[in-house]
């Protein structure tokens, strides 16, 4: 009898604990939900589609969005890049840091400044390596880099040199523009290759990017560039509010020339008043802790402005 009594008490306690735990979870969920839905006002929390313009432009060339296919392709890129908020905020911040340097080179090379957005979608403005082996901001393959005069070996990889790789991209884009008569097709060729674009033009008897049936990646390519261009140029229109103080600051640097080997980059950096990390951030194309340079080639090194 006594054991039965205590057994009932134990069951009652377990039931009470379960009720209390359920209540706590319910309240916690309600609080979390309320906080997520903008301070409890659920009517203020909405996700909206993006208004698609009737026309978009890239490098001074207009694309009229007058077909369902074109509208849906443009809509996809606007939606993906608007609602992948964390990535797009990073892209906007990095654009503030690197675009001034890239724009100067594009202008100097006679290439429309809209092409800075090509680098943005290629790499996110990071020195990344693709599964196929393309490297740097402009995602240059080893064969292409060497063809256009970049030094690429175990000691130096100039695909990571922003100045030289941007100038290479400009040479390629101008060559493609001369071949196809269109900056838009030049951008497509940067992704698909000039031969690939030429084959599509000949097989389909079309000369406008938007009228050519490309594979999935290339058919998205220019529309992705255009979407990021619109978002970065007018972030508030897409719901991105970033204070100027939160932007990544442009790099201020000067250049020095060197035509001899560097036996130890750590010591070399220290002599300039830098640590190894900061020196390599500005000169990522130097792959090792030394520079061979037996040929006495003239290299250009980037040094923080306050260290000159």
Where are the regions that the model predicts?
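Substrate-binding/active-site groove segments that recognize
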Residues: 133-154, 166-168, 173, 197-200
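Primarily a LysM-type cell-wall glycan-binding module
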Residues: 244-273
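Solvent-exposed, acidic/flexible segments
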Residues: 84, 88-99, 108-111, 130-138, ...
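An acidic, Gly/Ser/Thr/Pro-rich helix-cap/linker signature
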Residues: 2-110
């Amino acid at each position: 009898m006594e054991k039965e009594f205590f057994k009932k008490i134990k069951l009652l306690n377990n039931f009470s604990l379960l009720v209390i735990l359920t209540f706590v979870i319910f309240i916690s969920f309600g609080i979390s939900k309320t906080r997520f839905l903008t301070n409890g006002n659920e009517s203020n929390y909405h996700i909206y589609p993006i208004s698609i313009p009737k026309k978009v432009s890239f490098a001074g060339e207009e694309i009229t969005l007058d077909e369902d296919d074109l509208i849906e392709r443009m809509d996809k890129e606007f939606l993906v890049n608007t609602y992948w908020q964390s990535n797009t905020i990073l892209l906007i911040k990095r654009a503030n840091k690197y675009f001034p340097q890239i724009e100067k080179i594009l202008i100097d090379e006679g290439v429309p400044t809209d092409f800075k957005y090509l680098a943005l979608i290629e790499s996110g403005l990071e020195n990344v390596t693709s599964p196929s082996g393309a490297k740097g901001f402009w995602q240059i393959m080893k064969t292409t880099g060497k063809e256009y005069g970049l030094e690429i070996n175990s000691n130096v990889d100039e695909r990571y040199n922003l100045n030289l790789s941007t100038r290479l991209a400009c040479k390629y884009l101008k060559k493609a523009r001369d071949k196809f008569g269109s900056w838009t097709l030049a951008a497509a060729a940067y992704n698909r290759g000039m031969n690939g674009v030429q084959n599509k033009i000949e097989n389909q008897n079309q000369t406008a990017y938007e009228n050519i049936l490309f594979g999935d990646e290339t058919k998205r390519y220019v529309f992705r560039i255009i979407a990021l261009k619109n978002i970065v140029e007018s972030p508030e229109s897409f719901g991105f509010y970033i204070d100027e103080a939160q932007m990544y600051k442009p790099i201020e640097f000067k250049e020095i020339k060197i035509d001899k080997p560097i036996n130890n980059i750590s010591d070399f950096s220290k002599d300039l008043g830098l640590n190894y990390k900061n020196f390599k951030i500005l000169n990522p194309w130097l792959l090792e802790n030394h520079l061979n340079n037996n040929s006495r080639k003239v290299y250009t090194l980037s040094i923080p402005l306050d260290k000159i």
